[in-house]
Amino acid sequence: GSIFVHSDYRVSYLLRQVLNEIFGEENFVNEIIWTYQRPAAPNQQFFSRVHDTIFWFKKSNNYKFYPDQIRVPHDKKTLDNFKKGLKGSGFGDTDLNVGGKIPEDWWLIAPAYKSTKETLKYPTQKPEKLLERIILATTEENDIVADFFCGSGTTLAVAEKLNRKWIGSDLGKFA
């Protein structure tokens, strides 16, 4: 099994230490940077904060990862530089157009802003695309997805759409 824990800049450095103690540093898989765009205040005196962190830990070496479910297209420059049959590229017999690539550890995914059709106006709502990538990458149909801070319920809704069983709970009354 896997656990994904989301945080922002205020606690991510502390959270990683706590997660290492709980799950073991040897069970750390990835630190994923979820980046997004939003307008900056015209008078701000610092760089715009436009990313959050998602830590991925595994329960054991028998965790699941399905990269073919989440592949994304290569950019044009990569396709031009690493053409099939190009000697010395390391990709001589590989057609990069087939299937795409496994995403890097930074994901540019738009947040669920108030103006988007999926918003429920819950302050910490995550976009469906973000949760879909995580669920597709690490579960199969009929697997269980749990969200113990489910808030807006987006994780559970995406799990349902992807034919996963789900468990959700939250301390907030809105949830």
List the model feature ranges, each with a label.
Residues 1-175:
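Core catalytic lobe of class I
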